[in-house]
From Swiss-Prot:
It catalyses: mogrol + UDP-alpha-D-glucose = mogroside IE + UDP + H(+); mogroside I-A1 + UDP-alpha-D-glucose = mogroside IIE + UDP + H(+); mogroside II-A1 + UDP-alpha-D-glucose = mogroside IIIX + UDP + H(+); mogroside II-A + UDP-alpha-D-glucose = mogroside III + UDP + H(+). SUPFAM superfamilies: UDP-Glycosyltransferase/glycogen phosphorylase. Its EC number is 2.4.1.350, 2.4.1.-. Belongs to the UDP-glycosyltransferase family. UDP-glycosyltransferase involved in the biosynthesis of cucurbitacin and mogroside tetracyclic triterpene natural products (e.g. siamenoside I and mogrosides IV, V and VI). Cucurbitacins have cytotoxic properties and exhibit deterrent taste as a defense barrier against herbivores. Mogrosides are nonsugar highly oxygenated compounds used as high-intensity zero-calorie sweeteners; they also possess pharmacological properties such as regulating immunity, lowering blood sugar and lipid levels, protecting the liver, and acting as antioxidants and antitumor agents. This is Mogroside I-E synthase. UDP-alpha-D-glucose binds at residues 290, 351, 369-371, 374, 390-391. The active site is at residues 21, 124. Mogrosides, the major active constituents of S.grosvenorii fruits, are a mixture of cucurbitane-type triterpenoid glycosides that have been proven to be powerful and zero-caloric sweeteners and can hence be used as a sucrose substitute for diabetic and obese patients. GO terms for molecular function: quercetin 3-O-glucosyltransferase activity; quercetin 7-O-glucosyltransferase activity. Keywords: Transferase. It comes from Siraitia grosvenorii. Gene3D superfamilies: Glycogen Phosphorylase B (3.40.50.2000).
């Protein structure tokens, strides 16, 4: 009887189609498979074709299944996920396809597919339509937030900022301070720290209001899952707990796993052997993430600043990181620079393993949320170079609140880069090493059996079962062994 109940549990996960969202969703998919669920991972057709190592993931998790649906754009058209038109296309085109997919699992018997009907949906927090469809079909739905609790709370505070007259701001000053958001954020948040295109809001626009409505609709879900932990963001988790039925802080989610997942970029593992040849804490790791683009001039300023610092560095040079037509010439110039064993350039790196390597002593980062959590978990101080989205406020918290990194902001010149690299790898970095080491210790405890992130994950699993009114389920006896504790 217990096995029959076990076989009925089928969770569908649907992330926003960007690496920074897909990665933590894949982590959650693996964790739910470890707990004994059938899991369907839903991606766009475009990104599904780009995923690497799917066969390895499928072999490790037989209960994990992949589906894909159209995002409304032709296969050969570039995807600009920051363009409101792309977001609108997904919401309009994908909604009926999503509904049909859920219905198809009801129509086709589990004997034919080997999988039961969908009994729970976990959707990206910035999507409203999966909640609409799940409610229509009477399927329990949860929202998963892949950015910080702080940034999530700002979505709910934007209407109050409009009411108070702080938005829109006609003077064009994106550094204008915002007040009344929360005591712990007073004097720290600026207009450019707001979600979406609100950072540049000199008038109210429909796409801005729609983006907020899409995300705040997540409060209708059965609960909010967050990739964070309470010691890091306790005040904002507390505020979100007054908005949502339930919250589950399960971060750093990658630290709950013993295995590594696939992604949209092919990792070059040769850099790990190179790191083996370097002294402890002697290497600066440089990566602008999966989405950020910089100009050729900015790239060369970073490059020469790193060279002038005299420190060893590992540079992730994504194939599409440079804006403009002179990308090939700039990249050629970099690769023709004599390394003399001091540096290495790769197209994409296994970031978690790199940060965890004893040779890495600093991280020059775009300050995406996944990168921050991975750096904290590894105990590596950061140089923060924010560009888009939540990265600006992340930078403020790294440098001013948590004091685990330096704030570069818009100073993309070689002198600033050289100065900050020297600082993070020398005297100032030593102080931050102690601070972030303590935070890393807390993060490690949170994902242990006695930690709140581990317990919140178990609570989520139990709540999914309860919402499906399945009782007598016997926990996977190997579940604890499959987690990194």
């Amino acid at each position: 009887m217990a096995e029959q109940a076990h076989d009925l549990l089928h969770v569908l996960l649907f992330p926003f189609p960007a690496e920074g969202h897909i990665k933590p969703f894949l982590c959650l998919a693996e964790l739910l498979c470890n707990a004994g669920f059938h899991v369907t991972f839903l991606n766009t057709d475009y990104n599904h074709r780009r995923l690497h190592n799917l066969h390895l993931l499928a072999a490790r998790f037989p209960s994990l299944h992949f589906e894909s649906i159209s995002d409304g754009l032709p296969p050969d058209q570039p995807r600009d996920i920051l363009d409101p038109k792309f977001f609108i296309s997904i919401c309009q085109v994908t909604k009926p396809l999503f509904r049909e997919l859920l219905l198809s699992y009801k129509r086709i018997s589990s004997v034919q597919t080997g999988r039961p009907p969908i009994t729970c949906v976990i959707t990206d927090v910035i999507f409203r339509f999966p909640i609409d469809v799940a409610e229509e079909l009477d399927i329990p739905v949860f929202s998963f937030c892949t950015f910080s609790a702080r940034f999530m709370f700002l979505y709910f505070w934007i209407p109050k900022l409009i009411e108070d007259g702080q938005l829109p701001y006609p003077n064009g000053n994106i550094n204008q301070k915002l007040y009344g958001v929360a005591p712990e954020a007073e004097g720290l948040l600026r207009c450019k720290d707001l979600p979406g295109h609100w950072a540049f809001a000199d008038e109210l626009k429909d796409d801005q209001l729609n983006f907020v409505d899409q995300t705040t609709a997540s409060s209708r879900s059965s609960g909010l899952i967050l990739n964070t932990f309470d010691d890091l963001e306790a005040p904002f988790l507390g505020r979100l707990s007054t908005i949502f039925k339930k919250i589950y802080a399960v971060g750093p989610i990658h630290s709950l796993l013993n295995s590594h997942h696939c992604g949209l970029w092919k990792e070059d593992h040769s850099c790990l052997a190179w790191l083996d040849s370097r002294a402890a804490k002697s290497v600066v790791f440089v990566s602008f993430g999966s989405l950020v683009k910089i100009t050729s001039r900015q790239l060369m300023e970073f490059w020469h600043g790193l060279l002038n610092s005299g420190k060893s560095f590992l540079f992730v040079l994504r194939s599409d990181v440079v804006e403009g037509d002179d990308e090939k010439q700039v990249v050629k110039e970099i690769y023709e620079t004599k390394a003399e064993g001091k540096w290495l350039v790769v197209g994409w790196a296994p970031q978690e393993k790199v940060l965890a390597h004893e040779a890495v002593g600093g991280f020059l980062t775009h300050s995406g949320w996944n990168s921050i959590l991975e750096s904290i978990a590894a105990g590596v101080p950061m140089i923060s170079c924010p560009k888009i989205g939540d990265q600006s406020s992340n930078c403020t918290w790294i440098s001013k609140v948590w004091k685990i990194g330096l704030e570069m902001e818009d100073r993309y010149d070689r002198v600033s880069v050289e100065t900050m690299v020297r600082s993070i790898m020398e005297q100032e970095g030593e102080k931050m090493q102690k601070t972030i080491a303590e935070l890393a210790k807390q993060a490690k405890y949170k994902v242990s059996k006695d930690g709140t992130s581990y317990q919140n994950l178990e609570c989520l699993i139990q709540d999914i079962k309860k919402l499906n009114q399945i009782e007598g389920f016997i926990n996977n006896p190997n579940f604890s062994d499959l987690l990194r504790v």
